[in-house]
């Protein structure tokens, strides 16, 4: 009842009243009232209504306003942490210098307020969300705190008054339980309801949760209250059950209980089925229990019977596999259903159930700065961990959910204290490992490796969603995160049962993703599961391994290593048993995944390297070693097979696997441990056994015979060579790689860096990426640590970013120093690290280029031999590989085969053989000091070599060898021939016969048999009898292919060579000289000189080493060299061999021919490119240069680039220039000042567009149109500053009819990108420059030569009259058809048709708004204005391109490519259509003093524009264009003179306005005094005086702004400064006239100094013929008046005076125009990109107020636009495109804020230009992925600006695409 009355009163007073009640000591009535009120307000059945929230706010505030309350609470904030929580895509910072945990991150504010100068930091876009760690000493060093969190704020904050938060403590528990009840009620199991129901519930709750979030942001005081409520178990008990009478609450509670039921890892029913096995004592029962707990498939029954069988099999596997490990799940409670004791736990529970809604996550995280809360929350999180992962596996949105989970867990587990705490108290490690196992068990399948039928091993199935979508990563990343803490990792390593569990987890990945080689047809479906497999091994196995390894660095941790190694071996043994492995790997199977082997290898390596363990103590017996060796060796052989195209039928993915295996992110967790493991095996097993295993695995055993022919049962002959090369290369890598065998970390880093740099020059970031770093972030080899930088500067030189003339931009690159090539280039390391085989070639090419350049060696060098770092003593056994007979026999055989030119040998084979010999010579075995004598009879090859030392075996001569050859082999035939020659049997002395007999017994050699024998020997060391019973030679029988090969027969070959003699003979063969090594050679050899070179050098180096190390060898060598005999040619070459040799030779010759042709072609192409392509270079082909001066009066000939004919342009078949028309606003963006405008980066800065050239001209025109006659206005100014049409050409010409057919062919060709043929676009057929129109060339002579140039002697007045007459003849066009507007009956020639069509193109180039400035659009006046403005635009732009003046003379590139001459004629022809009414012809007003016309003004509604207001260059262009062509030069000069006087007068007027009143008076007096002197019309003083006195008549022209002007011109005007001002004012007009004269008459433009420009131009234009002294040129001296100057000036002034009705300041502003403009510039950008980024990436869009997803900036005007934003779309066109049309007439240059790159929009196309911001290493950072600080690269920005001004975007940038208005 009372509640109702309370509800009726206003909220404020109620709240105040209740608060007063509750403050009393006896507050029971207050409590009761509050409870009742809350019952009715917060009744959850009413749903969420805003009213309830409102009540809560008032109640919390207890009578104050809520905002006020917030402020008060904030003032008590005692938090020392920032704790700002952000969501995905937020921009945060990470500083590695300050971080203790690798996950440390800072918000932008804390980062910018801290001092991180010189630190290793980067900016990043958050993937999953995060929180700011500023102030948290567990995660980062205090030095990095920002100045706000550096002070321990807690100490000086007053304690909170009790009553402030009293109401909060009362109200909030009820508020929270309301939310919880709502969540309970809304929840339905996802199976039954659609996900969107959950979304709906969340939407309705949104305001409530937002309110909670708001509260958390109030600071420490409020957080404490919330923590208390959330963790208080008593309140939870009271409120959670629901009161008995409340049905709604009860119903909820039941829903909640049912939801809880399914929260265990295993649901209740399954548990029932397992029958409480958890309590069972017997091992089996416990196993079954654990099995059911682990959610195995035991209880799952499937309908499908076939599935069921499969399942049964699996279940058996599962049980047998897991009985061992089940008992170690210590605490079954991990798996049980959850029980909740406080609000926090239930809130988290619902957060999980609803799949982590963002708001809830943020609320829970916002509370973390509260320490008590942090601990409780972490425990709660761990308690729910299993449940979270279970939910994740079922979720449909696993990606978003993963991100949210990691968002939370990374905040909790990065803190070592917390992690240790929950590991100890809540068994975090057990939970994680168990959950991981549980996860993976959902996707196990039977392994098919080795014994497919009886294999008992299970592996994960990489095709399952769990692996394919990386669903496991949140779990694994948490696991890696906690293992990075030493205390946690030690616990893990000490807990043996956990380790065992972990090993069984790792074994799920052992042998996954098995490949079977396809032998018959190509595989139908290429599965891409391999990437999931590699990712899984790297993330789930390798990274935790690296994490553990970082804690095994010191002697004290030896035991950990021993334990891990022991368990690895046990698990491996179990694995071998499970897959049924005996001793031979099964054929044609390959898996790249052996994580158990790799764990074993890495812990071995660590133990030996860091913990001083003895290797032998960690190794198993020989038999186990042999087993361990098999699979890694299989991978190495298969790599070779894949590169030999033997797996080609398995599709591309198998190549992908081979590449991923060695790729930089994987190699140190995959190939490196594999090779290390093989090195360990090789150092401990019998070397003969190991070597023969290698050749057998590589399938090249059959090739290793002395016979010239053989049969290989397993390889095609074209695969033999690559496989042999592979086997030898592998042996070389095995013997020479030292990564785990004794190199220090620095040496490894250096070697890695050198090998990457040798392949290619690299950017800093790609180098960081390519150097395999220890994947665990805490490992200390942090990329970018100082040692990386030091190392880099040690081995490489930095090449600054440069530009190529084509405009493609280079990044800053590092390139190896010369001494690196000389001493450190290691081809073996390069081969090991290359993903693509072509990189090896690239490294060799670069190496040989270096040798050529430094003059060391000019030929084709061989890979250099590199000395190795010494072996760690533990691995000395590896050297025995190089000193075993088997290897020596192989080497001997191969040397012999190469010398005899047997097939399938190659240079690479020889190279590797020599490498092995040299390795052997450099690594002697220590034990045998005495050279062994063959004292013991060995079974098989005692007579090949006496001992095992390579040195002594080198000179051992082998006489006879017995070989098995096919009957067809040449050896057999040779023997038959011999027998035919001597019918008698060989009569030799008996001893030699026995000798031969002896040989026949011995010299047979079978690798396979040898290997079997050794294997047997090792296995049966104990019983001798068994060693006799060698297994039957299964290999031979098993490998025989079907079909009947020719019979094998045994033959004896006579050899009589030793390895030394073979080397000498090979030397002779390579050098093609008979006695290439003289006796004296040995004496003078110096091995150091032989470091670089080809095969000869290598052989010489080896021989030198051999003779230096053994006297015996030296003697033998001298004998051999002494005997020097011609190399024994192979006796008879069988025709087959001959053919193959010829073939080789022919191929070689063909290759040489091809090289020659290619070189010739390249040089031709280069010379063409230089002449035709180079856009910038002025030396273009003179042929195409249309404006080149012709000495003769002949017609100009043009070359057509399509049909190749040369001829004049005629009326019927006109020729045209290839041109590109584009609208341009570059001129309109010019400003007065030379300094570019700055880009605003704060709210205070702005850019004002009013002062640009375009804006000024617009204002001027509209001002005129207000007061003067429209048609006259349209002739008084030029338009085209914005959106003017610019015409440029590449200088090539073509027949217009040829062009049309060319366009047709393009139309049918669909492949052209970025060119729309419908719009007339094409590329020039010769130089491929982009173009879109053809400008017809006028028939006739090139330049007006001869008579037209004769200097004129006529007087000025005659010329003026002639010009006037010429203007009268408008209609007469000097072509055969006279064209008049009103005369339609005309024959149009082809030429005029083309001209019309070009005019149409020109009009279509720009937008309508840039053409219609008149009152009535489309009128002839308007058209007339547009046409002459096109000429003006092109002249002005050429001036800009020449640097704004003509000082540089005629050599400018612009002139060469200029088409102004042609353009002028086309425009002139078009303008001839309009006649200027002679009554209004400005010429008369310029040259006659006509007083008669004043009275005519009265009938006009508006006056014409006074002469002084008109734009002089416009008049010039109008006159020239409307007079008949060709114009005599004298007439041109006359027009210029007349207009110059007008320009000069305007200059005086503009100047006089700037004077103060006193100055005006003074100057007018001076002028009056000089007026009567002779030549006064050529002195500016008199003219100025006259002008001032005339203009003073006008009503207040001068009085308008006298105050401001006087302020402006505080400096006094001296005569010099006035003269300078006048010259500057006239210069723009003179420049344009001069340029026009240059194009029309071909006059050259001499260069000069800037100071002399005025005098030079006046001389060129013939204004200053009389005045010769160039020194002090007076501007007035150039005037030539045809009538009295003073009269004319008075008349012009009177026109202004007559404008009585115009307001005076307008007249003044029209008079005071200034024609000078600075060059166009882009905005000035700040040096540091961060300045732009921080201001703009958060700036909101002006139209919708939200922060745009892709903000962009216009670099021309600074506008802030949304790229692709839908908010700013107009008629389907997005904002960037719109802005480009508005600001740049369809050219836009935009900087994309979030990507730091610039895009160019040109019309309907766009392209990515690149970035002008580079990091410290000269690299772009597109999309800010690396987030390193970026700095403005001035050169690049200049290039961008230059391309903009020169309009060359279309030519220089190649990759254009259509934007469909979507940008």
From Swiss-Prot:
Zinc finger residue extent: UBR-type: 80-151
What if the gene is knocked out? Heterozygotes fail to form cohesive and stratified epithelium in their optic vesicles. Average somite angle is increased by 30% and the posterior central nervous system displays a gain of Rohon-Beard sensory neurons. Defects are the result of decreased Hh/shh-signaling demonstrated by the reduced expression of the Hh/shh target gene ptch2.
Q: Which InterPro entries does its entry note?
A: E3_ligase_UBR-like_C, UBR1-like, UBR1-like_winged-helix, Znf_RING, Znf_UBR
Q: Where is this region: Disordered?
A: 302-330, 970-995, 1128-1152
The entry's keywords: Metal-binding, Transferase, Ubl conjugation pathway, Zinc, Zinc-finger
GO biological process per UniProt: eye morphogenesis; protein ubiquitination; ubiquitin-dependent protein catabolic process via the N-end rule pathway
Matching Pfam families: PRT6_C (PF18995), UBR1-like_wing (PF22960), zf-UBR (PF02207)
User: Which domain of life, per UniProt?
Assistant: Eukaryota
One Gene Ontology MF term? ubiquitin protein ligase activity
Basic and acidic residues bias locations: 971-984, 1134-1152
- Write down what this protein is called: E3 ubiquitin-protein ligase ubr3
Native source species: Danio rerio
């Amino acid at each position: 009842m009372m509640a109702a009355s309370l509800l009726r009163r206003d909220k404020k007073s109620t709240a105040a009243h209740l608060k007063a009640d509750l403050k009393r000591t006896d507050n029971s009535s207050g409590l009761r009232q509050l409870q009742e009120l809350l019952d009715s307000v917060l009744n959850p059945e009413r749903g969420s209504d805003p009213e309830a929230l409102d009540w809560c706010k008032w109640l919390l505030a207890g009578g104050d306003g809520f905002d006020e309350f917030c402020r008060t609470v904030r003032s008590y904030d005692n938090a020392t942490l920032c704790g700002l929580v952000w969501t995905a895509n937020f921009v945060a910072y990470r500083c590695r210098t300050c971080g203790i945990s690798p996950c440390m991150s800072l918000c932008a504010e804390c980062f910018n307020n801290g001092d991180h100068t010189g630190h290793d930091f980067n900016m990043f876009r958050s993937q999953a969300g995060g929180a700011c760690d500023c102030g948290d000493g567990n995660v980062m060093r205090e030095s990095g705190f920002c100045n706000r969190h550096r002070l321990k704020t807690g100490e000086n904050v007053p304690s909170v008054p009790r009553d402030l938060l009293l109401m909060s403590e009362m109200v909030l528990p009820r508020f929270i339980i309301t939310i919880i009840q709502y969540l309970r009620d809304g929840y339905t199991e996802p199976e039954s309801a659609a996900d969107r129901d959950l979304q709906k519930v969340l939407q309705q709750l949104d305001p409530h949760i937002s309110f909670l979030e708001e509260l958390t942001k109030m600071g420490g005081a409020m957080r404490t209250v919330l923590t208390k409520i959330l963790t208080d178990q008593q309140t939870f008990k009271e409120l959670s059950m629901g009161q008995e009478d409340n049905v709604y609450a009860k119903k909820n509670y039941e829903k909640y209980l049912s939801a809880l039921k399914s929260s265990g890892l295993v649901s209740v029913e399954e548990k029932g089925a397992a029958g409480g096995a958890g309590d069972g004592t017997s091992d089996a029962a416990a196993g079954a229990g654990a099995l059911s707990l682990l959610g195995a498939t035991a209880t799952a029954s499937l309908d499908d019977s076939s599935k069921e069988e499969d399942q049964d099999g699996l279940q058996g596997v599962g049980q047998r596999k897991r009985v061992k490990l089940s008992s170690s799940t210590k605490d079954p409670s991990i798996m049980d259903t959850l029980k909740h004791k406080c609000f926090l736990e239930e809130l988290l529970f619902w957060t999980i159930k609803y799949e982590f809604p963002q708001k809830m996550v943020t609320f829970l995280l916002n509370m973390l700065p509260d320490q008590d809360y942090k601990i409780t929350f972490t425990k709660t999180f761990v308690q729910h961990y299993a449940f979270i992962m279970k939910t994740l596996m079922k979720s449909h949105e696993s990606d978003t959910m993963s991100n949210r989970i990691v968002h939370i867990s990374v905040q909790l587990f990065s803190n070592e204290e917390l992690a240790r705490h929950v590991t100890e108290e809540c068994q975090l490690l057990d939970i994680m490992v168990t959950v991981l196992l549980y996860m993976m068990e959902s996707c196990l399948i039977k392994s098919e490796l080795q014994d497919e039928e009886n294999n008992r091993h299970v592996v994960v199935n990489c095709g399952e969603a769990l692996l394919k979508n990386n669903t496991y990563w949140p779990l694994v990343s948490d696991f890696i995160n906690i293992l990075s803490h030493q205390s946690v990792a030690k616990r893990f390593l000490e807990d043996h049962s956990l380790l065992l569990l972990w090993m069984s987890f790792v074994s799920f990945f052992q042998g996954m993703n098995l490949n079977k080689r396809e032998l018959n047809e190509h595989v139908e479906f290429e599965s891409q599961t391999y990437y999931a497999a590699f990712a899984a091994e790297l993330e789930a196995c390798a990274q935790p391994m690296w994490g553990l390894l970082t804690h095994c660095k010191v002697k004290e941790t030896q035991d950990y290593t021993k334990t891990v190694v022991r368990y690895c071996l046990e698990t491996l043994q179990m694995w071998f048993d499970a897959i049924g492995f005996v001793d031979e790997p099964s054929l044609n199977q390959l898996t790249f995944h052996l994580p158990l082997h790799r764990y074993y290898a890495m812990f071995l390596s660590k133990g030996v390297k860091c913990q001083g363990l003895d290797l032998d103590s960690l190794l198993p017996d020989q038999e186990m070693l042999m087993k361990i060796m098999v699979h890694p060796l299989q991978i190495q052989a298969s790599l070779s097979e894949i590169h030999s195209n033997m797996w080609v039928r398995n599709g591309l993915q198998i190549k992908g696997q081979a590449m991923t295996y060695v790729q930089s992110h994987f190699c140190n967790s995959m190939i490196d441990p594999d090779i290390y493991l093989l090195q360990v095996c090789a150092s401990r097993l019998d070397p003969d056994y190991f070597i023969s295993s290698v050749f057998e695995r590589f399938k090249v055993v059959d090739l290793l015979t002395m016979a010239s022919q053989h049969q290989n049962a397993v390889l095609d002959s074209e695969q033999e060579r690559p496989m042999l090369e592979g086997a030898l290369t592998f042996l070389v890598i095995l013997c020479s790689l030292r990564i785990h065998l004794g190199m220090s970390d620095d040496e490894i880093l250096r070697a890695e860096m050198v090998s990457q740099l040798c392949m290619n020059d690299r950017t800093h970031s790609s180098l960081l990426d390519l150097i395999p770093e220890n994947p665990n972030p805490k490992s200390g080899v942090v990329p970018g640590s100082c040692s990386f930088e030091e190392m880099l500067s040690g081995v490489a030189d930095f090449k600054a970013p440069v530009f190529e003339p084509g405009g493609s931009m280079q990044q800053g690159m590092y390139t190896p120093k010369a001494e690196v090539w000389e001493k450190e280039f290691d081809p073996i390391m390069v081969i090991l690290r290359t993903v693509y085989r072509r990189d090896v070639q690239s490294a060799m090419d670069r190496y040989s280029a270096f040798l050529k350049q430094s003059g060391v060696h000019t030929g084709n060098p061989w890979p250099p031999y590199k000395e190795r770092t010494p072996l760690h003593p533990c691995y000395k056994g590896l050297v025995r590989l190089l000193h075993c007979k088997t290897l020596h026999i192989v080497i001997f055989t191969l040397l012999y085969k190469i010398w005899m030119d047997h097939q399938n040998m190659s240079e690479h084979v020889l190279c590797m053989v020599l490498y092995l010999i040299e390795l052997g010579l450099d690594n002697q075995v220590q034990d045998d000091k005495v050279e062994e004598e063959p004292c013991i009879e060995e079974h098989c090859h005692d007579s090949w070599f006496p001992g095992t030392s390579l040195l002594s075996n080198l000179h051992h001569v082998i006489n006879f060898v017995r070989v098995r050859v096919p009957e067809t082999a040449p050896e057999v035939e040779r023997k038959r021939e011999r027998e035919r020659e001597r019918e008698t049997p060989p009569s030799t002395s008996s001893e030699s016969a026995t000798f031969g007999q002896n040989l026949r017994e011995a010299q047979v050699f079978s690798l396979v048999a040898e290997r079997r024998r050794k294997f047997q020997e090792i296995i049966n060391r104990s019983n001798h009898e068994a060693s006799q019973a060698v297994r039957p030679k299964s290999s031979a029988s098993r490998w025989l292919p079907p079909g009947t090969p020719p019979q094998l027969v045994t033959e004896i070959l006579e050899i009589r060579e030793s390895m030394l003699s073979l080397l000498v003979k090979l030397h002779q063969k390579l050098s093609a000289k008979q006695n290439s090594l003289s006796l004296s050679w040995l004496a003078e050899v110096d091995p150091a000189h032989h470091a670089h070179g080809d095969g000869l050098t290598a052989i010489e180096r080896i021989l030198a080493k051999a003779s230096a190390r053994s006297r015996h060898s030296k003697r033998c060598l001298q004998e051999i060299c002494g005997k020097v005999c011609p190399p024994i040619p192979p006796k008879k070459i069988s025709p087959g061999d001959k053919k193959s040799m010829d073939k080789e030779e022919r191929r070689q010759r063909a290759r040489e021919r091809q090289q020659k042709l290619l070189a010739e072609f390249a040089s031709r192409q280069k010379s063409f490119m230089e002449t035709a392509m180079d856009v910038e270079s002025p030396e273009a082909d003179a042929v195409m240069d249309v404006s080149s001066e012709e000495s003769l009066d002949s017609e100009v000939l043009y070359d057509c680039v399509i049909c190749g004919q040369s001829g004049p342009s005629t009326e019927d078949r006109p020729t045209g220039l290839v041109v590109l028309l584009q609208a341009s606003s570059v001129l309109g963006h010019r400003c007065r000042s030379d300094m570019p405008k700055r880009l605003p980066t704060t709210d205070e800065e702005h850019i004002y567009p009013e002062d640009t050239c375009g804006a000024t001209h617009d204002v001027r025109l509209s001002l005129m149109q207000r007061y003067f006659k429209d048609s006259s206005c349209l002739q008084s100014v030029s338009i085209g500053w914005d959106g003017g049409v610019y015409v440029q050409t590449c200088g090539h010409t073509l027949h217009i009819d040829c062009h049309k057919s060319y366009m047709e062919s393009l139309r049918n060709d669909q492949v052209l990108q970025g060119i729309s043929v419908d719009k007339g676009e094409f590329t020039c057929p010769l130089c491929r420059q982009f173009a879109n129109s053809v400008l017809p060339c006028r028939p006739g002579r090139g330049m007006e030569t001869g008579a037209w140039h004769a200097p004129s002697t006529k007087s000025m007045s005659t010329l003026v009259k002639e010009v006037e007459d010429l203007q009268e003849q408008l209609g007469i066009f000097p072509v055969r058809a006279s064209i008049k507007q009103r005369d339609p009956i005309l024959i149009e020639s082809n030429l005029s048709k083309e001209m019309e069509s070009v005019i149409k193109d020109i009009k279509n180039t720009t937008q309508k708004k840039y053409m219609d400035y008149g009152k009535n659009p489309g009128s002839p006046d308007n058209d007339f204005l547009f046409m002459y403005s096109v000429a003006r635009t092109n002249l002005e732009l050429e001036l800009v391109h020449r640097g704004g003046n003509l000082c540089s003379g005629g050599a400018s590139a612009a002139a060469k490519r200029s088409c102004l001459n042609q353009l002028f004629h086309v425009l002139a022809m078009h303008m001839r259509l309009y006649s200027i009414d002679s009554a209004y012809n400005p010429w008369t007003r310029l040259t006659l003093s006509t007083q008669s016309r004043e009275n005519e003004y009265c009938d006009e509604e508006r006056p014409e524009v006074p002469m002084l207001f008109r734009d002089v260059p416009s008049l010039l262009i109008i006159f020239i264009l409307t007079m008949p062509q060709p114009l005599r030069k004298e007439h041109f000069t006359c027009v210029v003179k007349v207009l110059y006087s007008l320009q000069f007068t305007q200059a005086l007027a503009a100047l006089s306005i700037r004077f103060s009143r006193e100055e005006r008076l003074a100057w007018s007096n001076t002028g009056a005094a000089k007026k009567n002197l002779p030549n006064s019309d050529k002195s500016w003083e008199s003219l100025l005086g006259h002008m001032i006195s005339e203009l003073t008549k006008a009503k207040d022209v001068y009085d308008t702004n006298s105050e401001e002007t006087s302020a402006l011109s505080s400096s006094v005007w001296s005569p010099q400064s006035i003269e300078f001002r006048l010259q500057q004012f006239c210069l723009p007009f003179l420049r344009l006239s001069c340029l026009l004269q240059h194009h029309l008459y071909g006059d050259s433009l001499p260069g000069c100094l800037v100071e002399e420009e005025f005098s030079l131009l006046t001389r060129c234009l013939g204004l200053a013929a009389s005045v010769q002294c160039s020194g002090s040129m007076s501007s007035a001296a150039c005037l030539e008046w045809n009538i009295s100057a003073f009269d004319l000036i008075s008349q012009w002034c009177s026109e202004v005076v007559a404008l009585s009705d115009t307001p005076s300041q307008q007249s003044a502003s029209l008079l005071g125009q200034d024609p000078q403009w600075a060059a166009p510039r882009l905005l000035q950008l700040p040096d540091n990109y961060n300045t732009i980024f921080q201001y703009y990436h958060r700036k909101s869009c002006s139209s919708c107020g939200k922060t745009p997803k892709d903000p962009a900036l216009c670099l021309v005007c600074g506008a802030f636009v949304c790229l692709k934003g839908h908010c700013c779309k107009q008629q389907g066109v997005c904002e960037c495109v719109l802005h480009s049309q508005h600001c740049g007439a369809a050219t836009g240059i935009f900087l994309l804020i979030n990507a730091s790159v610039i895009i160019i929009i040109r019309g309907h196309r766009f392209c990515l230009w690149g970035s002008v911001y580079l990091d410290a290493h000269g690299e772009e950072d597109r999309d800010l992925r690396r987030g390193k600080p970026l700095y403005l690269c001035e050169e690049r920005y200049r290039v961008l600006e230059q391309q903009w001004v020169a309009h060359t975007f279309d030519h220089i940038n190649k990759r254009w695409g259509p934007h469909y208005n979507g940008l």
